[in-house]
Amino acid sequence: MNQQNLQAAKHRVLAYCDAFDHASESDMISVLRLHTHDEYSWRGMYPFHELSGHESVIELFWRPLKSAVSHLQRRPDVFLAGGHSLALHAPEPNSKQPLSDDDVWVCQMGHFMGLFDRPWLDIPPHHRMLSIRYVEFHRVVDDRIAESALFIDLISVMRQAGQNPLPPQTGASFVYPGPRTHDGLLFSEHPECEGVKTLQLINRMVADLSRANQHALETSDNAVPVSTLATTWHEDMIWYGPEGIGATYTLERYQHQHQYPFRFNLGSKTFNGHVARFAEGNYGCFFGWPNLTNTATGGFLGLTGSTLPADMRIVDVYRRDGDKLAENWVIIDLPHWLSMQGLDVLVRMRQLLGKETFV
């Protein structure tokens, strides 16, 4: 991938973020139009899903959020760009800007922070600081953003506001830090060979999981030896999972607090591919729409099983340290996955708050 193209795409996304974050309420649509294609498309977590057109994105997502969370500021921890091989990914998404091997994707990860002063999605405000985990992807074509995908941890927002839609989680809950090395904002050029190393390592890790899934289908053995993980992960790895699962530290605790509940309590797993998977320097990322389809057999998230297959839209951001992965930030659109099984966490919250009736 041409470094000039990567840097130009980064500059476009940074310019957009700066202008949009400082735009007045009346200027948000004009700023979005300035930096994006006319047929701009947007993907978001439940309950927003896929939106087309600038007005829809502003009126359905951004304006309600910014009205509810006063003084909203963006606090990025990771920023990278890269091209991608179409062979790695799912079929072309519903976009009027067709995919190309020359496209550049830009990823930014961090927290939105502000004061939760008004209801959002009927989540009651607590009038205190709110930290919203986010990962945002932009596909840049001809120096304009053709499509975006924004994932936030909605269940974390609910829990910070005193709403608890899920049983106690297996991992820890806190405001997750950025990279231990504090070098995740890749504004300048980085040697292409380092990004290649990172992507190859991520691909090898994904391939190991695919083989484990196939073995489980053939033998019903969902266990994965820690020695298998240790070929691609440092022993003191950190996994920052979504609220409802939580964060975990070291390979041993990762297996017991996330991997085994995930592997043993979810069946019929089908990998659907990734929309984008790329790396730059020591950092890499991907997201799918959905990445994975599975069926809850009982126990995952502390919930009962279901006979209904459900889709997981998953974001992963990685940091490589040497020849192994050291940190992994993950957002899963769990509310969407749950809604496909008949549990709408926002509807249930509204019912409990007396804002919506059961019939």
Predicted ranges, named:
Residues 1-359:
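C-terminal and inter-domain tail/linker signature
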